[in-house]
UniProtKB/Swiss-Prot annotation:
InterPro entries: DUF1328 (IPR009760). The chain crosses the membrane at residues 6-26, 29-49. The keyword Transmembrane applies. Belongs to the UPF0391 family. The keyword NADP does not apply. This is UPF0391 membrane protein Sde_0270. It comes from Saccharophagus degradans (strain 2-40 / ATCC 43961 / DSM 17024). It is a multi-pass membrane protein.
Amino acid sequence: MLYYSIVFLLIALVAGLFGFVGIAGVATGIAKILFFVFLIAFVVSLVIGRRPRV
């Protein structure tokens, strides 16, 4: 589960880099949306991964 958290974080950082720096140009809005979607997915996977297994 930690692997997926790291993957979500890296994807969010890349999407944010392209969206906020302006490299993507037209896709800036999409990159911002993807940044927040993957950032939320990262936080959720961190919380779920910390639960004790029953």
